[in-house]
């Protein structure tokens, strides 16, 4: 099994169309090179709970959910992808830095376990509704 952590659309630029193409190209290359199943062991992006936007802007709940949808489209197109593990279940504390004010916000739930929009999208995916 080939296991990869990838953050297209977050650490590697915010253009979701480019993220989708870059992710797919890379996963196809891994599949072609090794001929083994692929498990995406980490993927996602931060969202500040309650930060909403009519357009999908980085740090909003909409962007986080749309970013996950981008990854899921790629996973669903590629037979080589046999599993996925979104990063992360819930927001958590980290050392402060210019990219992490009050912790890591990649959780699909807040630190006190309130669901963000991404949690609802994942629920729909796992139930087969979306």
Kindly give the residue locations of the regions a language model identified.
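Substrate-binding/catalytic cleft of secreted carbohydrate-active enzymes
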Residues: 1-122
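Surface beta-strand/loop "capping" patches
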Residues: 124-130
């Amino acid at each position: 099994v080939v296991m990869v952590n990838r953050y297209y659309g977050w650490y590697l630029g915010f253009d979701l169309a480019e993220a989708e193409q870059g992710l797919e190209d890379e996963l196809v290359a891994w599949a072609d090179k090794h001929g083994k199943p692929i498990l995406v062991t980490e993927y996602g992006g931060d969202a500040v709970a309650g930060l909403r936007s009519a357009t999908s802007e980085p740090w909003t709940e909409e962007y986080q959910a749309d970013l996950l949808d981008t990854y899921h489209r790629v996973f669903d197109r590629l037979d080589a992808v046999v599993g996925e593990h979104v990063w992360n279940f819930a927001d958590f504390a980290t050392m402060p830095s210019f990219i992490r004010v009050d912790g890591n916000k990649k959780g699909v739930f807040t630190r006190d376990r309130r669901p963000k929009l991404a949690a609802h999208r994942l629920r729909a995916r796992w139930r087969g509704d979306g």
